[in-house]
Amino acid sequence: MSYVPIVVEPTSRGERAYDIYSRLLKERIIFVCSTVEDHMANLIVAQLLFLEAENPKKDIYMYINSPGGVVTAGLAIYDTMQYIKPKVATLCIGQACSMGSLLLCGGEKGMRYSLPHSRIMIHQPSGGYKGQATDIEIHAQETLKIKRLLNELYSKHTEQELKHIEKSMERDNFMSPEEAKKFGLVDNIMSSRDAMTLLAK
């Protein structure tokens, strides 16, 4: 089991201990820092809804370091980001690949960032199925539907032509932060917190 640091804060009722992620949640910071799957997605969605209920007018900051994962789990997070009232700023730390890159570019326009040495990757969805031929055909058709949906979402958030997105997504497409900015996945590259503070003003 991985170790999660604990921070202790003094309160009027004595000291209170938080795991580091819960403490950062108090500052409206959410971490998407693992493979995207259903349990993890449910936790992220719950945090987004909690922060909206706490203050629907205050921005949320989502830090992303993810290799991607299950498409439906990623779409659950993405849809919630679009659904809630607060603006969601996204910041890539390390990597934002596959569904991680969709979450990155799905942040509020003008508030999508990357650190200077992160890697961003987009590609078409993949899947493996076995069984009767008819069932395999059904799953293949569903995969093609998801492929079209993802292409449309990337086109929407990057403001690029759908045909260009389709071509760019055909194989694993790795980008530097500069390339991701040119592509429209992020708006700015942050080398220091001061730079983000200046942009926020």
UniProtKB/Swiss-Prot annotation:
> Does the record carry Hydrolase as a key word?
yes
CDD domains, A to Z: S14_ClpP_2
Write down the chemical reaction(s) this protein catalyses.
Hydrolysis of proteins to small peptides in the presence of ATP and magnesium. alpha-casein is the usual test substrate. In the absence of ATP, only oligopeptides shorter than five residues are hydrolyzed (such as succinyl-Leu-Tyr-|-NHMec, and Leu-Tyr-Leu-|-Tyr-Trp, in which cleavage of the -Tyr-|-Leu- and -Tyr-|-Trp bonds also occurs)
Enzyme Commission (EC) number: 3.4.21.92
Q: Tell where it localizes.
A: Cytoplasm
* InterPro entries per record: ClpP, ClpP/crotonase-like_dom_sf, ClpP/TepA, ClpP_His_AS, ClpP_Ser_AS
Pfam families in alphabetical order: CLP_protease
On whether Protein biosynthesis is a keyword of this UniProt record, the answer is no
User: Keyword annotations for this protein?
Assistant: Cytoplasm, Hydrolase, Protease, Serine protease
Q: Which SUPFAM superfamilies match?
A: ClpP/crotonase
Q: Which residues form the active site?
A: S98, H123
Q: Where is this protein primarily located?
A: cytoplasm
What enzyme category does the UniProt record give? hydrolase
Q: Which GO terms describe its biological process?
A: protein quality control for misfolded or incompletely synthesized proteins
Listed GO MF terms: ATP-dependent peptidase activity; ATPase binding; serine-type endopeptidase activity
Q: What is a single cellular component term in the Gene Ontology annotation?
A: endopeptidase Clp complex
Q: Which residues form the signal peptide?
A: none
Q: How does it assemble?
A: Fourteen ClpP subunits assemble into 2 heptameric rings which stack back to back to give a disk-like structure with a central cavity, resembling the structure of eukaryotic proteasomes.
UniProt lists the family membership as follows: Belongs to the peptidase S14 family.
The protein's job, in short, is: Cleaves peptides in various proteins in a process that requires ATP hydrolysis. Has a chymotrypsin-like activity. Plays a major role in the degradation of misfolded proteins.
The molecule here is called ATP-dependent Clp protease proteolytic subunit
Q: What species is this protein from?
A: Rickettsia peacockii (strain Rustic)
Instruction: Please state the gene responsible for encoding this protein.
Output: clpP
